[in-house]
Regions:
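Active-site-proximal beta-alpha core segment in soluble small-molecule metabolic enzymes
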Residues: 3-6, 11-14, 24-91
Length: 91
């Protein structure tokens, strides 16, 4: 059985805009499957909100557009050789 998510995009966009206007220093989190929206699409959308985007793991950094700085939430013992130089890693 499949689950279909339908979002009222006008209402959702208004909610996001309202929230971002009241919270300073907001860093959007885009991880996993992008909460059903798709990680790449959601990451692109999140760059309208902030210049830094948080992702779950080093393997999700590739979804962050080059115009944004990726922040990795999960510490890693092995840093991939092709990880972007601007990625912020947690310890």
């Amino acid at each position: 059985m499949a689950l279909v998510l339908t979002v009222n995009s006008d209402a959702w966009n208004k909610h996001v805009e309202s929230l971002t206007s009241t919270v300073s220093g907001l860093i959007p989190v885009v991880k996993g499957n992008g909460y059903g929206f798709g990680r790449d699409w959601l990451a692109q959308r999140a760059t309208r909100i902030a210049s830094t985007l948080a992702v779950g793991t080093v393997f999700e950094v590739g979804s962050v557009p080059t115009a944004a700085t990726p922040m990795v939430l999960t510490p890693t013992l092995e840093v991939p050789h092709d990880l972007r130089a601007d990625a912020i890693l947690t310890v």
